[in-house]
Amino acid sequence: MWQPEQRYFVFNPHYADEITEEVLDDFFRDPFFVGFKLLASYWLVPYDDPRYTRVWEYAEKHRLPILMHTWGREAEPFRTIAPKYPHAKFILGHTGGSDAGRQLSLELALLAPNIYLDYCAAFCSTLPWYQLAGKIDRSRLLFGSDAGPHNEAYELGGFLSMPVPDAELAPILAENFDRILAERI
């Protein structure tokens, strides 16, 4: 189960040479770190850059989640990356953000069962996020709030206000992510 004292290891590809597998082992030995977070657009290094390979391989080996900031067409490389690493859990943060990004995220999730969609910033697209629930397995939908940059009450209120039965929303709030964490090795 996700605990408040757990966080993602933020992998910056500009330091890929220094972040060896041994360094990752040292970090992930501590239960504080539960997966990776990547922000390709912040670092101006696209996800298909080979400097991310260590993340894909390490997450595959240890069945870790990888939360990626995705916006617009930014997630396109996962069309080929995700199938190569079936035990890694690729979480498309913001479900692509824009309308085009949301459509691409859904398309990618339909192609690869290890791609998950994150609710955070659902207000950035005119395409209703709840409609995803009818198109992919709900166990691959995750609630996220971007705690800090976004108002968590607003994000949660928007999520709970969707015209979806509570019994279908509840697992998205925590159970689905808890299942991902339970699979780590």
Predicted segments, located by residue:
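Short, solvent-exposed loop/turn segments at secondary-structure junctions
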Residues: 12-16, 40-43, 73-74, 97-98, ...
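Mid-to-C-terminal alpha-helical segments outside catalytic/metal-binding sites
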Residues: 138-140, 149, 153-185
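Secondary-structure boundary/capping residues
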Residues: 4-7, 90, 141, 168
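Mid-domain alpha/beta scaffold segments of enzyme catalytic cores
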Residues: 1-44, 50, 54, 58, ...
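Short aromatic-enriched loop/helix-cap "lid" or pocket-rim segments at secondary-structure transitions
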Residues: 20-21, 103-105, 129-130, 154-156, ...
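Catalytic pocket-lining loop regions of alpha/beta-barrel enzymes
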Residues: 34-35, 45-142
